[in-house]
Amino acid sequence: MTSEQYSVKLTPDFDNPKWIGRHKHMFNFLDVNHNGRISLDEMVYKASDIVINNLGATPEQAKRHKDAVEAFFGGAGMKYGVETEWPEYIEGWKRLASEELKRYSKNQITLIRLWGDALFDIIDKDQNGAISLDEWKAYTKSDGIIQSSEDCEETFRVCDIDESGQLDVDEMTRQHLGFWYTMDPACEKLYGGAVP
């Protein structure tokens, strides 16, 4: 794996309607009670309580994952017991993305990497340091974002930068950073057709 393969677009495009639409889509998906507002409570419920419990995480893995989710969405300004409406949510994402890109450019650990490490440990059932397509399918079935096997396989292909047939946490981090923060063209179709 060359460092060039892991280079990512570091300039955000916050005014791009597609970037805004991508985040609006997820805002609506994460709005568990469909009231037009989300809170850290909903984020943790959706990301940890539902997904992680469905994957059979150990108590230690679940705690690590929950801590990572709290830190990540806390970085976007989310708080327990405080409902956030769309305009505040997207502004929080802009702040989060800007800070994360600064960290990434300095080879510092990002919040998305910490979340990726925690999630990777749970998905990697055989603990061989890589995620197989079957392990990825089990994860995507539980998270509810990707509904079709075609989208699941497309996501796997986009993340498999080195074309090894397995995913490592560096590949996953790089692709998610590019997809959610900067709309890096190399990350398009990260969720197949499930997320714009």
UniProtKB/Swiss-Prot annotation:
Ca(2+) 3 binds at residues 160, 162, 164, 166, 171. It comes from the Eukaryota. This is Aequorin-1. Belongs to the aequorin family. Signal peptide: none annotated. One of its GO terms (biological process) is bioluminescence. Residues 47-57, 62-72, 107-117 are annotated as: May interact with the chromophore. Residues 1-7 form a propeptide. Ca(2+)-dependent bioluminescence photoprotein. Displays an emission peak at 470 nm (blue light). Trace amounts of calcium ion trigger the intramolecular oxidation of the chromophore, coelenterazine into coelenteramide and CO(2) with the concomitant emission of light.
